[in-house]
Amino acid sequence: MSDQKFISIRGAREHNLKNVDLDLPRDKLIVMTGLSGSGKSSLAFDTIYAEGQRRYVESLSAYARQFLEMMQKPDVDQIDGLSPAISIEQKTTSRNPRSTVGTVTEIYDYMRLLFARVGIPYSPATGLPIESQTVSQMVDRVIALEEGTRLYILAPIVRGRKGEYRKELAELQKKGFQRVKVDGTFYEIADVPPLDKKYKHDIDVVVDRVVVRPDLSTRLADSLETCLKLADGLAIAEFADKPLPVGETAEGGSANKSANETHERILFSEKFACPVSGFTIPEIEPRLFSFNNPFGACPTCDGLGTQQAIDPNLIIPDESAALKDGAVAPWARSSSPYYNQTLEALGKAYGFKVSARWSELSEEARQAILYGTKGREITFHYDDGLRSYQTTKPFEGVIPNLERRWKETDSAWSREEIERFMASTPCPACNGYRLKPEALSVKIGKKHIGEITEMSIRKADAWFRDIDGSFNEKQREIAARILKEIRERLQFLNDVGLDYLTLARNSGTLSGGESQRIRLASQIGSGLTGVLYVLDEPSIGLHQRDNARLLDTLRHLRDLGNTVIVVEHDEDAILTADYVVDIGPAAGVHGGKVIAQGSPQDIMANTNSLTGKYLSGAMEVAVPAERRKISKTKRLRVVGARGNNLKNVSADIPLGTFTAVTGVSGGGKSTFLIETLFKAASRRIMGSREHPAEHDRIEGLEFLDKVIDIDQSPIGRTPRSNPATYTGAFTPIRDWFAGLPEAKARGYQPGRFSFNIKGGRCEACQGDGVIKIEMHFLPDVYVTCDVCHGKRYNRETLDVLFKGKSIADVLDMTVEEGAEFFSAVPAVRDKLETLVKVGLGYIKVGQQATTLSGGEAQRVKLAKELSRRATGRTLYILDEPTTGLHFHDVAKLLEVLHELVEQGNTVVVIEHNLEVIKTADWVIDLGPEGGDGGGEIVAVGRPEDIVQEKRSYTGQFLKELLERRPKRSSQAAE
């Protein structure tokens, strides 16, 4: 095969790959699929991408290499036909509060440039545009007036300020000026009446009197320059023969006119300055619109748009609690009598008892406790059992006291404690727009840059397409190239189904799928060709409706002349690929081989391919024969949810069932389920400090005793955390080893078998198994510890064996092997078997938590929940649990979730995967669109009911799925 047309891989052995040889066609859309843990990512990311990136970086100078991440050389004999590689992974973009969708996609950078070049500043006082002018422009403006027009050229030296101004007038006389206009009247300087210093005055110096004619330019330029020097960049041309109507002058009662404005006048400014309010803007440059730059950032919030402030709702989390029982949350933990005695003294002054509930207190008493007595003195009696004393002073108030301590303390612990009672509120100075008033006064089409970032991408796209209609010829020419860049980028974000996001949205709040698609849009914007792109499940979090747009985008990337490799489980993606590689046959040690390759039809025809069987319909996730009965009485009811884009939504979730919350991306699913239901329920039932989104109430919580959100956040942030420690299997493993005869003879306790504490661990690497060596031009190298050879424990600890295996050998087993090895030890076996149940039999017992994907971390948490004793009164909430799962894994996961429901629990999932939705007992479909166009309940009921609803996109695709499976299996058979 010619190298040019193929990427040929020989002998790939990274992770679990079994010496894989593979030829992939270049410039095609290639999908790699297979069970979770079968080796897809090992081949796509750890072999192909790593080698492509490593070769590219290696070709750079040593100086350039130090700034780039250098990849380890993968375990492979040879790869030919590679291009420079770009990987677009699942990781959430950035936790930096300054990073927004606009900054990540670079759209905001182009917007800053656009506003700096064609934006017009408006005066906040008059609402009129303010422009900086050169002297030549001022002269041209005057010369353009009708010939013979009589004008006074004035320098406004005092504008609405108190004072006598004797000294200033004397100075002017010395400089040779003769006339001034004071408070609306012209005087010779010598004849100006004494000014009352208690009142505001206006003084304009008469620099020249002119009659407009063509040869006036030189004289006029000199006069205007004199004005600009005298009046700090301002000059006035006043029409001598055009007095204003009396009602429009200051004397006639007009509030926004100065006393000197008696005639029509033209105001010139060589700076961007509003001549009325004195509001000035220095030069208008792109940095003025950057909230990451002191020139543009709002000085109050430093460009963050929010401020941390004590939230009264967190101070009093439960209004039905009595004061003596800890209604005031920051005081509730203290065992000292001080706080109770403080409340008793306040009670005497404001007429309440400490046995009263917060809800029973008068508004005045509540204000006094929260915000202080505002100077009113209270007599406090204190007695702590050792001494008693009395003091009379105003009470500071719980909130001012916490704010003061937060500002003054040096203790990180104290700050953290107080921050538990703080919430983010929009900055009052910039209203959350992050910028200085100067930046927000610059507008295009009556909107400032902050208002545009608040629009959804769909609306912003329409706005930028229409805006050049309001430009003049010069502005249109300047803006053309900038607008092209902005429009293209917005179009790509639209194409990957992110039209509901706003440009101001914080990057840290995006899901993994959203941040990956944003990076994908940025890549298309860069328009590279001849590149190898490797993507990791870009369809995560996308509704079937938007999937077609995403696949178009991937094809567009291919058509530019790139090779696109996608690790994906989505049926449509597999069917649209030019080439499919199915890796398996199973996970972990049982995987790592290429089972089938070729066109989607070849995969379906291959009897060894599990993926092929699901695609052809030979195997499928079964629809339950009958759905669970829906109880009329036992149900949760969310009433009046209004968070984010929800439009006063009320919905029932039947208890003891499997419910799916569906809808297009941005429809309001997470706001409804996580931000409203989970946070409110965990606050009521578990006493958490979560702050739910706005809603009226939640009914039916009395049927629950626990609510658990099983999300995709990491199970631990250090390499020391692993599935065994997280699920609690490691404790019985250590106990078992400590109970062995050899360990007892040596007097070893369970702590001896921990790699986190001194005693049993290898001290050379402190139980890490590797030692980090910093290299400056190369990646940091982790060298296996030469004392313990990566085993983490010292020799004495490793001498203790069970069935010929040490504790280090156990940590190196896969979960499946571990469950078999400990088959006689139920405490260990049961915990490991739950991991096998959720499809994680392939991961190592001691695998570092940092190497688990989001979907794997979520399933480890699910396994931990499964291994707990069932109470049957728990509400489990899962956000897209099928992330990273093959059809076959989805079938297994559904068994687990339905098992939880069989125990009497309630499981609610946010899900786009139709295989999951069709097995649900109850479906709540939100939408119909994303962002502003969503937030309503479109359909609710059993899957069969959803299919009937014309407005439901989910229903349309579900109907198609239920109808097309039988058709396809007959085609595959042919």
UniProtKB/Swiss-Prot annotation:
<feature type="domain" description="ABC transporter 2">
    <location>
        <begin position="630"/>
        <end position="959"/>
    </location>
</feature>
<dbReference type="InterPro" id="IPR013815">
    <property type="entry name" value="ATP_grasp_subdomain_1"/>
</dbReference>
<dbReference type="GO" id="GO:0003677">
    <property type="term" value="F:DNA binding"/>
</dbReference>
<keyword id="KW-0234">DNA repair</keyword>
<keyword id="KW-0227">DNA damage</keyword>
<keyword id="KW-0479">Metal-binding</keyword>
<dbReference type="Pfam" id="PF17760">
    <property type="entry name" value="UvrA_inter"/>
</dbReference>
<dbReference type="GO" id="GO:0009432">
    <property type="term" value="P:SOS response"/>
</dbReference>
<feature type="binding site">
    <location>
        <begin position="663"/>
        <end position="670"/>
    </location>
    <ligand>
        <name>ATP</name>
    </ligand>
</feature>
<dbReference type="Pfam" id="PF17755">
    <property type="entry name" value="UvrA_DNA-bind"/>
</dbReference>
<dbReference type="InterPro" id="IPR041552">
    <property type="entry name" value="UvrA_DNA-bd"/>
</dbReference>
<dbReference type="GO" id="GO:0005524">
    <property type="term" value="F:ATP binding"/>
</dbReference>
<feature type="zinc finger region" description="C4-type">
    <location>
        <begin position="762"/>
        <end position="788"/>
    </location>
</feature>
<dbReference type="InterPro" id="IPR004602">
    <property type="entry name" value="UvrA"/>
</dbReference>
<keyword id="KW-0863">Zinc-finger</keyword>
<dbReference type="InterPro" id="IPR041102">
    <property type="entry name" value="UvrA_inter"/>
</dbReference>
<dbReference type="GO" id="GO:0006289">
    <property type="term" value="P:nucleotide-excision repair"/>
</dbReference>
<keyword id="KW-0963">Cytoplasm</keyword>
<dbReference type="InterPro" id="IPR027417">
    <property type="entry name" value="P-loop_NTPase"/>
</dbReference>
<comment type="subunit">
    <text>Forms a heterotetramer with UvrB during the search for lesions.</text>
</comment>
<keyword id="KW-0228">DNA excision</keyword>
<feature type="domain" description="ABC transporter 1">
    <location>
        <begin position="331"/>
        <end position="610"/>
    </location>
</feature>
<dbReference type="GO" id="GO:0005737">
    <property type="term" value="C:cytoplasm"/>
</dbReference>
<keyword id="KW-0742">SOS response</keyword>
<feature type="binding site">
    <location>
        <begin position="34"/>
        <end position="41"/>
    </location>
    <ligand>
        <name>ATP</name>
    </ligand>
</feature>
<keyword id="KW-0677">Repeat</keyword>
<keyword id="KW-0547">Nucleotide-binding</keyword>
<protein>
    <recommendedName>
        <fullName>UvrABC system protein A</fullName>
    </recommendedName>
</protein>
<dbReference type="InterPro" id="IPR003439">
    <property type="entry name" value="ABC_transporter-like_ATP-bd"/>
</dbReference>
<dbReference type="InterPro" id="IPR017871">
    <property type="entry name" value="ABC_transporter-like_CS"/>
</dbReference>
<keyword id="KW-0067">ATP-binding</keyword>
<keyword id="KW-0862">Zinc</keyword>
<dbReference type="GO" id="GO:0008270">
    <property type="term" value="F:zinc ion binding"/>
</dbReference>
<comment type="similarity">
    <text>Belongs to the ABC transporter superfamily. UvrA family.</text>
</comment>
<keyword id="KW-0267">Excision nuclease</keyword>
<keyword id="KW-0238">DNA-binding</keyword>
<dbReference type="GO" id="GO:0009381">
    <property type="term" value="F:excinuclease ABC activity"/>
</dbReference>
<dbReference type="GO" id="GO:0016887">
    <property type="term" value="F:ATP hydrolysis activity"/>
</dbReference>
<dbReference type="GO" id="GO:0009380">
    <property type="term" value="C:excinuclease repair complex"/>
</dbReference>
<comment type="function">
    <text>The UvrABC repair system catalyzes the recognition and processing of DNA lesions. UvrA is an ATPase and a DNA-binding protein. A damage recognition complex composed of 2 UvrA and 2 UvrB subunits scans DNA for abnormalities. When the presence of a lesion has been verified by UvrB, the UvrA molecules dissociate.</text>
</comment>
